[in-house]
């Protein structure tokens, strides 16, 4: 039955706190020192995150009465869907069913803590080409704990701790699937701003549905899932030395930073099997609740007209906490130089080695492998929703290497008059490692059995990537306050190899790269007023790997507007329009066609108004 109506309802809060102390010490006119220490900690997440799903149908006897007789969609351009024009009215007439198998709750709560200390020392020189030297050390100790949980309601008379079989969705209430007109908004949602179109778009009235659950089942309960947590502890020790030099026309610096990272990543990885769903009758078909043989199973619940098996007979789940310790050290040299060829011409150069550690989620998100039997899939089809038979799953990659790159820049700038500059820059970045998402069928051995896990989602490292290109930029400001800024970047990347578990599994351009990117800003400014219009265009952006094909974000452009007015020297009014062009972002799979649509996203046209008071 289509369409399935679904959505989410969330109540959450977060608290972030920071405490810092900095001490600056002028040891002498030529020696300076600074010491900084602090702690930052935060916690937060939903107290409720609830999903409800429904279908436009109602069971009458042994048959279903459908509330929608037509479904069609078109994925060209802005995706659109078309349904029976009277779909909303049919829902109001009570032709609807709560899909209890797709009605659930899952929330995440996170705690983050970090302690840090940094010491910096500067030695100044009064004469000679050496301007100063700087050296110092920094220590960071960060911890992240994330756990998930559920908000649920249990049937009257059931143990509130019985999450598996006591929830109303588990079938202990045979009327749980009966949808009332009040569960839906009285009118279809009409203010669809972008991203997709639909001739009719019914919505779920979450406050009304949750109020119904509270009145029917006596209030909600929360539980924490011990089999869905992750922990990361990351200690970073670093020290640096830098020498700054200056002559009449040449200035710059050369230095090195040594960084040692100690990292512990732990997650709960689970294996869950969905073996069956409904009790079978003598012929092997799902047993109807009205079947005389059903009387022999008085504790079994009724769902969609059939007897649903208890959790322990239908599913099984095991999990284990898996942690990995890693330690690595990086030596990161850097060099910067600027040469004033003339009073208006400057040549700049830079070379450095940089790293970026993998994101916490990439190395510690809980893993999950799920098996769906043919019996389970067939039963779920009867109930109105089905997965694909076989193994599926996802998991983090605790062996991810940090992003590493050696980068070079060379630029020439011409300051041809006050308030005006034109420049050209060349760049090259040799990327040793980068992280990208991968979705692929993966052979695994699970409990001694060789299986094929379909569409396994994880993270992998890209190796030996190259990004090189040219940047053109300029700015010109007229005497009366009008000005323009422009920037264009051309970026050429190679096909980097993708490595997972030590094996090359494919190739991909450098993730996050776009061949072309341009920005143009027009502005006017005087003592009282500032107006700015910025147009940004980014070419096709490379994403991760999905079943051997690269994910691409199509070219995107956006216009932003900003104004500010100084009422007095102390008061300023501001206003902004973000995405004035109502641009949408479209993602597709593969370079041979744009027809494999993954998503089309509209972030909205956003308006901001503000006032600033300086005192």
Annotate each predicted stretch with a short phrase:
Residues 39-43, 52, 109, 113, ...:
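Transmembrane beta-strands of outer-membrane beta-barrel pores
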Residues 346-348, 356, 362-364, 373-455:
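Membrane-embedded beta-barrel scaffold of Gram-negative outer-membrane proteins
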Residues 1-2, 62-101, 149, 158-226, ...:
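Flexible glycine-rich, low-complexity coil/linker segments exposed to the extracellular/periplasmic environment
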Residues 426-431, 435-546, 581, 610:
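Gram-negative outer-membrane beta-barrel transporters
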Residues 29, 33-35, 131-137, 250-256, ...:
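Transmembrane beta-strands of outer-membrane beta-barrel proteins
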Residues 50-59, 149-159, 223, 268-278, ...:
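Flexible, surface-exposed loop regions and adjacent strand-edge segments
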């Amino acid at each position: 039955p289509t369409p399935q109506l679904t959505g989410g309802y969330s109540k959450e809060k977060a608290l972030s706190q920071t405490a810092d102390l900095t001490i600056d010490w002028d040891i002498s006119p030529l020696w300076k020192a600074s010491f900084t220490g602090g702690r930052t900690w935060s916690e937060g997440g939903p107290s409720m995150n609830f999903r409800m799903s429904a279908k436009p149908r109602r069971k009458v006897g042994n048959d279903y009465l459908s509330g929608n007789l037509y479904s069609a969609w078109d994925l060209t351009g802005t995706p659109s869907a078309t349904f029976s024009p009277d779909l909303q009215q049919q829902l109001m007439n009570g032709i609807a069913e709560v899909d209890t198998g797709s009605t659930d709750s899952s929330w995440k709560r996170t705690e983050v803590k970090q302690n840090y200390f940094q010491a910096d020392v500067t030695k100044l020189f009064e004469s000679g080409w050496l301007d100063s030297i700087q050296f110092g050390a920094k220590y960071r100790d960060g911890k992240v704990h994330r756990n998930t949980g559920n908000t649920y309601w249990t049937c009257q008379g059931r143990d509130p701790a019985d999450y598996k079989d006591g929830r109303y969705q588990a079938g202990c209430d045979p009327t749980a699937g009966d949808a009332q007109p009040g569960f839906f908004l009285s009118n279809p949602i009409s203010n669809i701003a972008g991203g997709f179109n639909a001739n009719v778009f019914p919505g779920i009235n979450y406050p009304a549905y949750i109020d119904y659950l509270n009145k029917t089942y006596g209030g909600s309960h929360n539980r924490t899932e011990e089999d869905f947590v992750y922990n990361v502890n990351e200690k970073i020790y670093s020290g640096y030395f830098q020498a700054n030099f200056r002559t009449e026309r040449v200035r710059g610096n050369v230095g090195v930073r040594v960084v040692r990272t100690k990292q512990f990543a732990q997650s709960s990885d689970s294996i869950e099997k969905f073996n069956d769903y409904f009790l079978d009758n003598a012929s092997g078909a799902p047993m109807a609740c009205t079947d005389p043989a059903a009387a022999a199973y008085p504790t079994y619940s009724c769902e969609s007209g059939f007897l649903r098996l208890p959790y322990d007979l239908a599913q099984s789940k095991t999990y284990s906490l898996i942690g990995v310790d890693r330690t690595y050290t990086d030596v990161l040299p850097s060099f910067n130089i600027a040469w004033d060829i003339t009073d208006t011409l400057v040549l700049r150069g830079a070379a450095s080695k940089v790293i970026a550690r993998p994101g916490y989620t990439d190395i510690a998100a809980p893993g999950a492998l799920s098996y769906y039997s043919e019996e389970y899939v067939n039963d779920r089809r009867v109930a109105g929703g089905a997965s694909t038979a076989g193994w599926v799953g996802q998991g983090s990659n605790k062996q991810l290497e940090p992003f590493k790159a050696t980068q070079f820049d060379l630029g020439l700038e011409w300051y041809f008059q006050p308030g005006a500059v034109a420049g050209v820059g060349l760049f090259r970045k040799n990327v040793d490692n980068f992280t990208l998402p991968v979705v692929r069928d993966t052979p695994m051995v699970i409990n001694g059995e060789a299986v094929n896990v379909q569409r396994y989602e994880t993270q992998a490292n890209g190796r030996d990537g190259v990004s090189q290109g040219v940047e053109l930029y300029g700015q010109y400001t007229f005497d009366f306050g009008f000005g323009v800024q422009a920037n264009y970047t051309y970026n050429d990347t190679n096909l980097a190899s993708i490595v997972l578990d030590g094996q090359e599994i494919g190739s991909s351009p450098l993730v996050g790269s776009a061949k072309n990117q341009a920005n143009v800003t027009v502005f006017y400014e005087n003592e009282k007023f500032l107006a700015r219009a910025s147009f940004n265009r980014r070419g096709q952006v490379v994403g991760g790997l999905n079943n051997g094909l690269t994910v691409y974000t199509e070219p995107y452009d956006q216009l932003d507007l900003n104004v500010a007015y100084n009422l007095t020297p102390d008061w300023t009014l501001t206003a902004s329009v973000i995405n004035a062009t109502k641009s949408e972002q479209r993602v597709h799979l593969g370079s041979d066609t744009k027809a494999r649509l993954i998503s089309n996203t509209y972030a909205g046209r956003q308006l901001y108004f503000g006032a600033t008071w300086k005192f």
